[in-house]
């Protein structure tokens, strides 16, 4: 697991580097599906003092199998998403400013331009709010459940992120680094949408044919963006 712990450590260290976290407000995980184990950031440990060996390994029930610290308080959310969506290899949660602002407003991040469409096939959805019972019960598990309720059976890698109402963004990808990449993009397009709607409050969504072109040329069966 050392290689995966190193990857998760590096991905977590990317969060402050890209300006996605303040203090300890974020976490990254990755899964080894063959072993049924997840590596995740320890809870409340400052980034500047964190080391690769501080990463915590848990099984799919959340039991710690390796590590001296408690895992992230959001571990149950990560595990619920891994259980539901086999294509996920890494998950990120942050409180990045602009994506969190959309979450607090209770609004999806609208697809307004090609930057958004290069990564997200449509709006980045916002979940419903959790009930008092859901919050007082298994809060983190229920956060995962409300994300799944919102995504349904859609391919999560076509919409690699979501904002949880009154909470903040979660993003995911093929692995931990891909998940962080998508979290960075989500924050940028959230900022762009806020600025664009401020300039033109009547601004419409990106034309569907343009969105389809930009998403499919990067992610479709005949994708041609980048190098083989």
UniProtKB/Swiss-Prot annotation:
InterPro entries: Aldolase_class_II_sugar_metab, Aldolase_II/adducin_N, Aldolase_II/adducin_N_sf, UlaF. The keyword Isomerase applies. Pathway: Cofactor degradation; L-ascorbate degradation; D-xylulose 5-phosphate from L-ascorbate: step 4/4. It is an enzyme of class 5 (isomerase). Substrate binds at residues 26-27, 43-44, 72-73. The active site is at 118 (proton donor/acceptor), 225 (proton donor/acceptor). Induction: Induced by L-ascorbate. Repressed by UlaR. The keyword Cell inner membrane does not apply. One of its GO terms (biological process) is L-ascorbic acid catabolic process. Its EC number is 5.1.3.4. Zn(2+) binds at residues 74, 93, 95, 167. GO terms for cellular component: cytosol. Gene3D superfamilies: Class II aldolase/adducin N-terminal domain. One of its GO terms (molecular function) is aldehyde-lyase activity. Keywords: Carbohydrate metabolism, Isomerase, Metal-binding, Zinc. It catalyses: L-ribulose 5-phosphate = D-xylulose 5-phosphate. Its cofactor is Zn(2+). Binds 1 zinc ion per subunit. Belongs to the aldolase class II family. AraD/FucA subfamily. Catalyzes the isomerization of L-ribulose 5-phosphate to D-xylulose 5-phosphate. Is involved in the anaerobic L-ascorbate utilization. PANTHER family: FUCULOSE PHOSPHATE ALDOLASE, L-RIBULOSE-5-PHOSPHATE 4-EPIMERASE ULAF. This is L-ribulose-5-phosphate 4-epimerase UlaF.
């Amino acid at each position: 697991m050392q290689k995966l712990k190193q990857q998760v450590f590096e991905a977590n260290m990317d969060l402050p580097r890209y300006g996605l976290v303040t203090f300890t407000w974020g976490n990254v995980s990755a899964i080894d599906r063959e072993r049924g184990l997840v590596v995740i950031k320890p809870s409340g440990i400052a980034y500047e003092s964190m080391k690769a060996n501080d990463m915590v390994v848990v099984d799919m029930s959340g039991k710690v199998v390796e590590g001296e610290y408690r895992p992230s308080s959001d571990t149950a959310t990560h595990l619920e998403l891994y259980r539901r969506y086999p294509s996920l290899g890494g998950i990120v949660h942050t409180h990045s400013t602009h994506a969190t602002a959309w979450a607090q407003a209770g609004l999806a991040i609208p697809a307004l331009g090609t930057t958004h469409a290069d990564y997200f096939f449509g709006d980045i959805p916002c979940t419903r709010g959790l009930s008092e019972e859901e919050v007082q019960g298994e809060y983190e598990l229920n956060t995962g459940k409300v994300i799944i309720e919102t995504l349904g059976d859609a391919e999560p890698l076509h919409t690699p992120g979501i904002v949880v109402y009154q909470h903040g963004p979660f993003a995911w990808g093929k692995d931990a680094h891909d998940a962080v990449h998508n979290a960075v993009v989500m924050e940028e397009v959230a900022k762009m949408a806020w600025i664009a709607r401020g300039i033109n409050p009547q601004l419409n969504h990106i034309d569907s044919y343009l969105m389809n072109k930009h998403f499919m040329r990067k992610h479709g069966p005949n994708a041609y963006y980048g190098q083989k």
